[in-house]
Curated annotation (Swiss-Prot):
Gene transcribed to yield this protein: tfe
Family listed: Belongs to the TFE family.
Complex formation: Monomer. Interaction with RNA polymerase subunits RpoF and RpoE is necessary for Tfe stimulatory transcription activity. Able to interact with Tbp and RNA polymerase in the absence of DNA promoter. Interacts both with the preinitiation and elongation complexes.
Name of the protein in its database record: Transcription factor E
GO biological process, one term: transcription initiation at RNA polymerase II promoter
Keywords assigned: DNA-binding, Transcription, Transcription regulation
Native source species: Sulfolobus acidocaldarius (strain ATCC 33909 / DSM 639 / JCM 8929 / NBRC 15157 / NCIMB 11770)
Keyword Transcription regulation tagged: yes
Note on domains (UniProt): The winged helix domain is involved in binding to DNA in the preinitiation complex.
Amino acid sequence: MLNLAKELVGDEALGLLKYLIGKKSEITDEEIAKELNTKPNEVRKYLYLLSDHGLVTYRKTKDKDSNLYIYYWKVNVNQINEILLSRKRLILEKLRNRYEQEKDGLFYFCPQDNIKYSFDDAIENEFKCLKCGTSLSQYDSEKARSFLEQKIKQIEEEINKEIRRESSKSY
């Protein structure tokens, strides 16, 4: 699941997420910055990114002395697996759609520029590359289909494994 989180938020934010996973209670952005020896603005930027993806949540209170808001952050433990699982399902759906396109479509490519064209686009351009004018060759989508089949199977297995793990936790 952390690999998917990395794809969503990048290495820097993933490091912060791992740090927060290790925390047992809420922590302020200022405390995080101090502990990680990072600028508070940098920490906030990544916290907001993680929050946008639902991976962390925050609670906001107003400081009585300074009248400023203090944000307390924590990992969204209740939702993190569900969020990442739904992202995997979305990726799986896109891969299946792409597989169907590769399976059902006829494609051409420019051997010079490696640009792929649909059959309709190839006809419209008289089977010439728009970029360099080279004649297009028919594209064998077998490698792409094979790769997509592999990825689809891998993600289906990951999803099923997560579902089994979650259902075993509830008993």
